[in-house]
Every structure is written in structure tokens, then in C-alpha cells.
Regions:
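C-terminal helical "lid" subdomain and adjoining coupling/linker elements of P-loop NTPases
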Residues: 261-283
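AAA+ P-loop NTPase catalytic core and its hallmark functional loops
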Residues: 1-248, 256
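Amphipathic alpha-helical interaction segments
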Residues: 62, 253-256, 274-281
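Residue-level recognition of alpha-helical structural elements
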Residues: 247-250, 272
């Protein structure tokens, strides 16, 4: 359904800016000397850490550049490669609040920008402005992830284009106000296709992202499926009781089968594939 902003802890606007530095090698297990800003304490809307998560080197670097230098980063990859989870797990370790909005659902312009609500105050009906998810996020230390970016409706994309343009400033004409982004607001997106539309016809409902939209993303990175070894490792980490000689071979075979479905999907012979999530529930 449409994004529900009521369950966000929006009642307090945090005056927080990053107050901790994290070492990329220690925090994400990737081989690079890099210190990245984050928060020392948990804030509302920080994702939970999955200790077994395996970070992809290039995707992690791209997303960390987004967090450290306020770059707009888009992660592209086939269904099931775990694009949004990757961003969330980085945010979790930086203790950076992170919110995902799936653009292929029924998200409207009003959901993003906000609307006037009629409320009762001291027995009188008055109209009061309620921020939408985008207007709220812009004013907070939040990493906002637009999922399925290539499936967004034109009216919604038009709104997003506005914040990609003017240094992130957003003008609300009805409200007669300009929202300037919080210094720790970050913007990410995930897409199934590299903005080229979908030549295979696999992704129903994906629009071609126009070049103007693509150029405004500072970094576009591609996340592919894991190698058989890495994916097997993840499954064994998540289900330790399978970590014995006999079951190990079985899990590796399951992963190989899943890989075949992905190859078939890429070449257009199959219309569905087994994502790592599917293999995990099968195991």
C-alpha cells in the first residue's frame, strides 16, 4: 500500500549531525582505509543490524561516498540482488536513520509532499499542514531510499527531480515556504534497470528514466549476484546447523541451481528467478 507516515517517529525534529567516525575495514569488512561519519547513538528509524550480512566491495564504497560526501547514489541490479538491504545494512552500522519508499506502489505526490488536514482544536475545525514523507525526511538526519526508482509515476518523478536539481531545496508553493535539506539528509535510489528502460520485457511497468534524471545522480553502481561460494557462506552463517560436510554440499547445489535460474532470467528464457531470499527459505 501507500507509504504510511504515521508510524514514523516524526514528533521530534532531531538537531543532530553525525558525531562519530567509523572505520570502513572494521565496520564493513572491506579492504580499504576509509573513515566514514555516522552517529554514536541509536536514533529512531535506524535499521536493525544483520550480523551475517556480506558487503559487496564496490557497492559499499559507492554508498559510503554517499553518506560521507552527501552524494546522490543509485544502486542498480537485477531483482533479488539485495540492493535496498545493502543500503539499509550500511545505514544500520553507521546508526543513520534510514527510510525506504517503494515507488512502484501507489505513492502519490501528496504522500511525498504533504497535505492540509482538518483538525479539531479547542472545539473549532481548523486546517493544519501535515508533512509528507519527503518533506519530513528532508528536514531530518535521514537516508531516504527510493526503491524501484525506474517504476515511479511521472508526477512523483517530477517532485523528485525538483530536489535533485536545486541543491536539494524544495519549494512548497501552497505553503509558501522553501525547505532546505538537513545537513545529514541523504538520498539513495535502487533500480532494476540502468535507466535504459527494460529491453528484455521482464520488468513490467518500468519507465525509461530520462537522461536529465540520470545525470543528476552523482554515482550509479551495479550490484550483481554473489558468487556461489559467497552465497553458500551467507546461508551457512544464517542457518549454522547446516554447516557440516553433508549439508554444505547440498546448500552449494541449491545455490548453483538458483544461479542457473538467474542466468535463464537474464537471457530471457525464464520469467522468474530464485533470489538469495528464496534459497534461504528453501534451505
Amino acid at each position: 500500500g501507500a507509504f504510511d507516515t504515521t508510524n514514523l517517529e516524526t514528533n521530534r525534529v532531531h538537531s543532530t549531525i553525525p558525531d562519530a567516525m567509523y572505520d570502513a575495514r572494521e565496520t564493513f569488512g572491506i579492504d580499504i582505509d576509509l573513515k566514514v561519519p555516522g552517529f554514536a547513538h541509536d536514533l529512531p528509524n535506524v535499521p536493525e543490524i544483520d550480523d551475517t550480512y556480506q558487503f559487496d566491495h564496490d557497492t559499499t564504497l559507492a554508498v559510503l561516498a554517499g553518506f560521507a560526501h552527501n552524494r546522490r547514489v543509485m544502486v542498480q541490479g537485477l531483482h533479488g540482488t539485495g540492493k535496498s538491504t545493502h543500503i539499509e545494512q550500511i545505514a544500520a552500522r553507521l546508526k543513520w536513520p534510514c527510510i525506504r519508499i517503494n515507488l512502484d506502489s501507489h505513492v502519490s505526490r501528496i504522500d511525498l509532499l504533504g497535505k492540509d488536514l482538518i483538525v479539531l482544536k479547542e472545539g473549532k475545525q481548523i486546517t493544519e499542514w501535515k508533512d509528507g514523507i519527503l518533506t519530513w525526511a528532508l528536514q531530518n538526519p535521514v537516508a531516504l531510499v527510493f526503491d524501484e526508482y525506474d517504476a515511479g509515476r511521472p508526477d512523483v518523478m517530477f517532485v523528485i527531480q525538483r530536489i535533485l536539481e536545486a541543491e536539494g531545496k524544495l519549494t512548497l508553493l501552497d505553503q509558501n515556504k522553501i525547505i532546505r535539506p538537513h545537513p545529514a539528509f541523504r538520498l539513495f535510489a535502487t533500480a532494476n534497470t540502468i535507466g535504459l528502460g527494460d529491453t528484455t520485457g521482464l520488468y513490467h511497468g518500468t519507465q525509461q528514466i530520462n537522461q536529465g534524471q540520470m545525470d543528476r545522480w552523482n554515482i550509479v553502481t551495479v550490484l550483481n549476484y554473489l558468487s556461489v561460494e559467497d552465497e553458500t557462506k551467507i546461508i551457512l552463517a544464517k542457518i549454522p546447523e547446516l554447516n557440516n560436510a553433508e549439508s554444505k554440499d547440498e546448500v552449494a547445489s541449491m545455490v548453483q541451481l538458483a544461479n542457473l535460474t538467474r542466468q535463464g532470467f537474464r537471457s530471457g528464457d525464464l520469467s522468474t528467478l530464485m533470489s538469495p531470499r528464496t534459497v534461504l527459505s528453501w534451505a
